[in-house]
Amino acid sequence: MEQRATLRERAFQFGVGVMRIAPMVRGLGPEFVPVADQLSRAATAVGALLEEGATAASRRDMAHKHRLALREARESAYWLRLVRARGASAETLTPLEREAGELSAMLTASVRKLQTPRRT
């Protein structure tokens, strides 16, 4: 349970970090306004889905929420790469890109564990 709480907190902090850089992303040009919006949606969805999963009715439902959170984490990584390609500060983006990758790895492991039948 402790690891899940850590995962949820890290996902929350990831969302906060992305929300902090959203104005900078919008400032890259008018074509980046929708990118900032998509990045913000994807990054905050990771934590929201994990919160939903924490109260899942079943192990299968929790695995489903974690799979969706994984998709959102990977989408966030994509948008961050796109912003970096436009020349945004690596100093700002690198920690968020790293965290998106680490969250993806943690979520992949979590989904695998949740899909493994429990031994009674």
Positions of predicted regions on the chain:
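Short, C-terminally biased terminal segments at protein or domain edges
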Residues: M1-T120
